[in-house]
Each structure stands twice: as structure tokens, then as C-alpha cells.
């Protein structure tokens, strides 16, 4: 339980810093002349760098341990937020998201840390704890960012810098290493073959499709939403901060308390299916909502759907994988998700520049296709013993069940 708490607070502080810039970013980008495609590019490049970092940092953490990877990325995050605070042009803002996106790849190390300290039976609950840290970070961060913006455009970024440095100092003293030296493996850091291996497994393929399409649709939605809300409902940083706070509080409540109870009753597969279709409807109705109150209400439905989907999908990846390849498959899923988050923002942003309504309908349709893919998932296999988690396979793994 103590180790759960340590990684929870490490991820929490990291995500508060991330959440601080969320309600500021679309208006910051518009200040430099960015429309749908330009803002989508800022969001997409963050995920592109997260994809690169996910491929690198998960394997690097297998080689040198989780702790040094997490500590180093906290310092890199501070650099990215410094650039954000003092961005004087679109391209400096773009560069700041490149740096922060690379640091954001540390989530693979954080999830591997949680997997190291849990048994397969506890793994979905452990991922729910990480998800709760996301939720609370998204609750607190946007509120802090919206408040800090009253003190100047640099203030939110500087607060995020301070939090990143504070996170580094606290983690340096309280975050122990979770991966024993004898379990560490040296592999090529930029070998992306694990993505193809995961997709090639019939048992895993539908889940990999879900992992690609859900982030694509959701990330595209996050580009269209603030632009539409500003144009149609007159939203500013305050209103957007409230929306992100609703998402964060809901995620923290669902993943931190309710998810463990729900997943034991209905299972991960059912939650993945329900979550994708719930998000599809909540996204598609947005351009037809005439008031902020209705948009906030549907945001709650979206947040509940996403909050049950995310840890359930992560848990399914873990239990579907071969015992000595769990980290490999989890890393592949994270990388595929990052590619979806890279493609979604410029795609939906470009469509938004042509038609706001079409952008939401497209994002909702993509989410619905993900739901159909989830229907084809095989029953969850049984696992009986804890296994070490890596982001690269062991030499000569046993054949898969596929």
C-alpha cells in the first residue's frame, strides 16, 4: 500500500503540472494565429514525441530501472514548461510541446512501476490508482492554471515549472526502485518490432485497434471542443478550466473508488465496450448543444465513459499478454495510442476548419468503430501467478496462445 501511495503522488504532481496548461493552451495558440490545424499541430506533436519517448523510456527503464527514468523526465518537463511560459511565437510554443511531449512518455515507466509491484489479479486496480492520479491532476491543474492566468501569460507555465522541480526533489527522496537488478534486460532502445508483434496476435489485434482509434477520436475531440465552445458559447479560460475540472473529478472518483467495484462485477471487456460507445455518443452531440450547462452535463457522461474505459483497456492488455511479455505488449499499446493521439488532432482540426459539426461527427464515428472492434475481443484468459513486467520480451519466449 505504501508503494501504491508513493507512485500515486509522483504521478499526481506530474499531472497537476500538465493540467495547469490545458485551459490556457488553445487561447495561447490562437494568440499566435493558430486555427484548427495549427492548434491540432501543437496537440499532435506532443503525442508524437510521447510516442517516441514511450518506445525509448519503457525499454530504458528495463535497462537502468524505473526510478532514474522518472526523475530525469521530471527535469525535462521543467524545461518544457519554461519554454511554454516565455513563448513569444507559435514556433516556440510548438517547441515547448515537443519537449513536454517527450517527458510525457514517462507514463510507460510509471505504469511499469505499478505493474512491478502488483500481481495480475491486482493489476487493473493498480492501473486504476494511476488513473485516479490522472483524474485528480486534471481536477486541480486546470483550476490552478485558470487562476494563475490572471497574473500574466507566463504565470501558469512558471507554476508548472515549480511543480516539476518540487516533484523531482520529493521523488528523489521517497521513490524507491521497483525493478530488481537481476530482472533488468538490455535491448535496443529504438526497436519498434514489439508493435508489429502485438498487432500480429489474433487475441490482441482487436484491442490494439481500440487502443489506436479511441485516442485518435478523443484527442481530435479535445482540439475541436475549445475552438467550438469559444466560437459558439463565448468560452474563455475559466469555462474551459471548469470543464477539465469536471473531467478530472469524475475520473478521480470513478477510477479511485468505483472502478475496482465495477470491474469485479462486469469485467474489463464489458467496460471497454460500454466506455467506447458512451464516449462516441457524448462526442457526437456536442455541436448540437445550445448551452454551457448541457455541454457540462454531456462532459460528465464522457468523463465517466473514459474513466471506466482507460484502466479496463490497460488491464486487458496486461492479462491478454504472455506472462513474460506483459511489458512488451503494454509498451506497444501505449505506442499505438500515442500514434492515434498524434494523428487525431491535425485530422480533426483540419476538418473543424471546414465544418465544426463534421469534426465532432467524425470523432464520434471513429469512437463507435472502436466500440465495434471491442465487441470482437475474446473472453479474458485466466492468470494465476504474478509475473515481472518488462517493456521488451525475454529471450526465447514461449509461444503465444494465439
Language model regions located:
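Helix-loop-helix hairpin linking two adjacent transmembrane segments in secondary transporters
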Residues: 130-173
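Juxtamembrane intracellular "pre-TM" segments in multi-pass secondary transporters
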Residues: 1, 176-209, 393-397, 401
Amino acid at each position: 500500500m505504501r508503494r501504491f501511495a508513493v507512485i500515486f503522488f509522483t504521478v499526481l504532481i506530474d499531472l497537476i503540472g500538465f493540467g495547469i496548461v490545458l485551459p490556457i493552451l488553445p487561447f495561447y495558440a490562437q494568440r499566435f494565429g493558430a486555427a484548427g490545424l495549427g492548434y491540432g499541430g501543437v496537440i499532435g506533436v506532443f503525442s508524437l514525441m510521447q510516442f517516441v519517448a514511450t518506445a525509448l523510456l519503457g525499454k530504458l527503464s528495463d535497462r537502468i530501472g524505473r526510478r532514474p527514468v522518472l526523475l530525469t523526465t521530471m527535469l525535462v518537463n521543467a524545461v518544457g514548461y519554461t519554454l511554454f511560459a516565455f513563448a513569444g511565437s507559435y514556433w516556440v510554443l510548438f517547441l515547448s510541446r515537443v519537449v513536454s511531449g517527450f517527458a510525457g512518455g514517462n507514463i510507460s515507466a510509471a505504469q511499469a512501476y505499478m505493474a512491478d509491484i502488483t500481481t495480475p489479479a491486482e493489476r487493473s486496480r493498480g492501473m486504476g490508482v494511476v488513473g485516479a492520479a490522472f483524474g485528480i491532476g486534471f481536477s486541480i491543474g486546470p483550476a490552478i492554471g485558470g487562476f494563475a492566468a490572471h497574473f500574466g501569460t507566463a504565470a501558469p507555465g512558471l507554476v508548472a515549472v515549480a511543480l516539476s522541480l518540487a516533484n523531482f526533489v520529493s521523488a528523489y527522496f521517497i521513490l524507491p526502485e521497483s525493478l530488481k537488478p537481476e530482472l533488468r534486460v538490455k535491448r535496443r532502445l529504438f526497436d519498434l518490432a514489439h508493435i508489429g508483434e502485438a498487432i500480429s496476435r489474433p487475441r490482441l489485434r482487436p484491442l490494439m485497434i481500440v487502443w489506436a482509434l479511441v485516442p485518435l477520436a478523443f484527442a481530435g475531440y479535445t482540439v475541436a471542443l475549445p475552438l467550438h465552445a469559444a466560437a459558439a458559447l463565448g468560452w474563455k479560460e475559466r469555462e474551459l478550466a471548469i470543464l477539465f475540472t469536471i473531467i478530472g473529478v469524475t475520473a478521480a472518483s470513478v477510477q479511485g473508488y468505483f472502478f475496482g467495484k465495477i470491474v469485479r462485477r462486469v469485467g474489463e471487456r464489458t467496460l471497454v465496450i460500454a466506455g467506447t460507445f458512451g464516449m462516441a455518443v457524448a462526442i457526437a452531440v456536442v455541436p448540437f448543444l445550445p448551452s454551457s450547462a448541457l455541454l457540462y452535463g454531456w462532459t460528465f457522461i464522457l468523463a465517466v465513459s473514459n474513466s471506466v474505459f482507460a484502466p479496463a483497456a490497460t488491464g486487458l492488455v496486461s492479462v491478454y499478454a504472455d506472462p513474460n511479455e506483459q511489458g512488451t505488449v503494454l509498451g506497444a499499446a501505449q505506442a499505438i495510442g500515442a500514434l492515434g493521439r498524434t494523428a487525431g488532432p491535425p485530422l480533426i482540426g483540419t476538418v473543424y476548419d471546414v465544418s465544426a459539426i463534421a469534426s465532432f461527427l467524425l470523432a464520434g464515428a471513429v469512437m463507435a468503430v472502436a466500440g465495434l472492434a471491442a465487441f470482437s475481443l475474446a473472453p479474458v484468459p485466466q492468470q494465476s501467478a504474478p509475473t515481472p513486467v518488462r517493456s521488451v520480451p525475454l529471450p526465447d519466449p514461449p509461444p503465444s496462445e494465439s
